[in-house]
């Protein structure tokens, strides 16, 4: 996908009746963002990147439906968690449910990281209000599709050189991309 192209539509599927369609969760991740994290792997992805680390998450009808409140209870049950990561699949395909969940997580002092095959520019150019709401709740966005030709195992928190770690609040405030600098 062309990162300068306006994103006019992001397929909003997978969620049903306020529930989230997920492939699974990891209760104690240290690889899906900084700190000790709870990771939610959403189900459904339109990108189907060759070499994807999670190809089982591509099917929009796969996975299972869960109540966001159940995930919230699991997260809050662990006082050691520093944040929650939305991965996939493509989280922005279930933007409305995730935006509401992210707002509750923020209220409880947790930060939000989100992996997306869309670029920051595509997301900010998207017309769906729910996509904008989710983006406003994200602290760090790992953007862009995984590109096998740019695979780089030395990168922190990303798989290929085209992907960026973006400080979303600073980027939204400045009107341009502000890269996030990992600690250490």
Map each language-model feature to its residues:
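Receiver (REC) domain switch/active-site residues of two-component response regulators
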Residues: 139
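P-loop/Walker A phosphate-binding loop and immediately adjacent motor/lid segment at beta-alpha junctions
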Residues: 94-106, 113, 151-184
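Glycine-centered loop/turn positions within well-structured domains
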Residues: 47
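Conserved C-terminal portion of the radical SAM core fold
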Residues: 78-86, 142-148, 172-184
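Short Gly/Pro-enriched loop/turn and capping motifs at secondary-structure junctions
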Residues: 119-121, 146-150
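N-terminal [4Fe-4S]-dependent radical SAM core
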Residues: 2-41, 50, 54-60, 177-178, ...
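Conserved Radical SAM active-site core
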Residues: 13, 17-24, 36, 54-134
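Residues at the C-termini of beta-strands that transition into short coil/loop
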Residues: 26, 145, 169
């Amino acid at each position: 996908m062309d990162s300068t192209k306006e994103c006019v539509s992001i397929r909003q599927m997978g969620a049903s009746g306020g529930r989230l369609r997920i492939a699974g969760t990891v209760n104690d991740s240290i690889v899906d963002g900084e700190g000790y994290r709870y990771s939610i792997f959403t189900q459904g992805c339109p990108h189907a990147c060759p070499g994807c680390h999670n190809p089982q998450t591509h099917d929009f009808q796969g996975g299972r439906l869960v109540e966001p409140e159940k995930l919230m209870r699991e997260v809050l049950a662990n006082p050691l968690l520093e944040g929650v990561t939305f991965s996939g699949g493509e989280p922005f395909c279930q933007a409305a449910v995730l935006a509401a969940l992210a707002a509750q997580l923020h209220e409880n002092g947790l930060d939000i990281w989100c992996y997306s095959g869309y670029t920051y520019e595509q997301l900010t150019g998207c017309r769906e209000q729910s996509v904008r709401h989710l983006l406003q709740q994200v602290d760090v966005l790992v953007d862009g599709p995984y590109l096998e030709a740019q695979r780089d195992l030395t990168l922190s928190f990303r798989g290929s050189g085209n992907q960026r770690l973006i400080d979303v609040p600073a980027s939204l405030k400045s009107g341009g991309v502000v890269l996030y600098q990992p600690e250490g």
